[in-house]
């Protein structure tokens, strides 16, 4: 039960961080307060950091909302490709 509650709270933190309601620094401070500076806290902070960096919603090489394509078309005129969680303009996947 405790493990499920922790997972649910963690997913809630990810949603809040990715929606932009509060910033990454505040989220990481809350993790330090609630979980502490240990291995689990470090993993939680790493996931929050990855989610906060993901401004174009690229997940596992898939442009889920089309934001990467729109961004690249607007800025460079090239096609946008998702590389993991990063958006790269005009650079296709090589694998």
Curated annotation (Swiss-Prot):
Modification after translation (UniProt): Disulfide bonds are critical for antiviral function, and their disruption inhibit viral activity.
UniProt note on tissues of expression: Expressed by the venom gland.
Keyword annotations of the record: Antibiotic, Antimicrobial, Disulfide bond, Secreted, Signal, Toxin
Chain coiled-coil ranges: none
Disulfide bonds, paired cysteine numbers: 58-82, 68-87, 72-89
Ranges where the BetaSPN-type CS-alpha/beta domain occurs: 55-95
Signal sequence, renumbered to the chain: 1-19
Main location class: secreted
InterPro entries reported in the protein's UniProt record: Long_scorpion_toxin_alpha/beta
Subcellular location: Secreted
Job of this protein: Antibacterial peptide. Dose-dependently inhibits Dengue virus (DENV), Zika virus (ZIKV) and Hepatitis C virus (HCV) infections. Two mechanisms of action have been described by two different groups: one involving activity on extracellular particles, and the other regulating the immune system. On Dengue virus (DENV), Zika virus (ZIKV), suppress the established viral infection, similar to the effect of interferon (IFN)-beta. Mechanistically, upregulates the expression of IFN-beta by activating interferon regulatory transcription factor 3 (IRF3) phosphorylation.
Stated family: Belongs to the long chain scorpion toxin family. Class 3 subfamily.
Protein name as it appears in the record: Scorpine-like peptide Smp76
Organism: Scorpio palmatus (Israeli golden scorpion)
